[in-house]
């Protein structure tokens, strides 16, 4: 019985470490994107530009990123719906299997 608890404990620890690793990878990816964004901004800004031109570039970039965020939110909703549909189908199949097995 204690080995079962140890297995469960180790599995939970492994899952926690996996989540931490994914979270850390996300932070690395996000910071790399910030570096790329700043490099792109430096490419667009020229010494002869006015303040208004620089602000216009930044506003345009902001709008582009907001559109991307919206696209990702929509994609996440679609993925979540697909996961719910799959979970529902698995429950249905499990129930069918239980009913079929119970009749034998």
Curated annotation (Swiss-Prot):
Entry-linked HAMAP family: Pole_loc_TmaR (MF_00683)
Family the UniProt entry places it in: Belongs to the pole-localizer TmaR family.
Coiled-coil annotated residue ranges, if any: 7-34, 76-96
Localisation per UniProt entry: Cytoplasm
Keywords on record: Coiled coil, Cytoplasm
Role of this protein: Pole-localizer protein involved in the regulation of several cellular processes.
Signal peptide: none
Pfam families (alphabetical): DUF496
Name of the protein in question: Pole-localizer protein TmaR
GO cellular component, as recorded: cytosol
InterPro entries xref list: DUF496
Gene: tmaR
């Amino acid at each position: 019985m204690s080995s079962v608890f140890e297995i469960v404990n180790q599995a939970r620890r492994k899952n926690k470490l996996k989540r931490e690793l994914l979270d850390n990878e996300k932070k690395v990816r996000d910071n790399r994107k910030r570096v790329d964004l700043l490099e792109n901004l430096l490419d667009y800004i020229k010494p002869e530009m006015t303040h208004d031109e620089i602000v216009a570039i930044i506003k345009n970039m902001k709008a582009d990123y907001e559109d991307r965020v919206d696209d990702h939110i929509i994609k996440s909703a679609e993925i979540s719906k697909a996961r719910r549909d799959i979970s529902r189908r698995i429950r249905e199949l499990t129930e069918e299997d239980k009913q079929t097995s119970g009749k034998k």
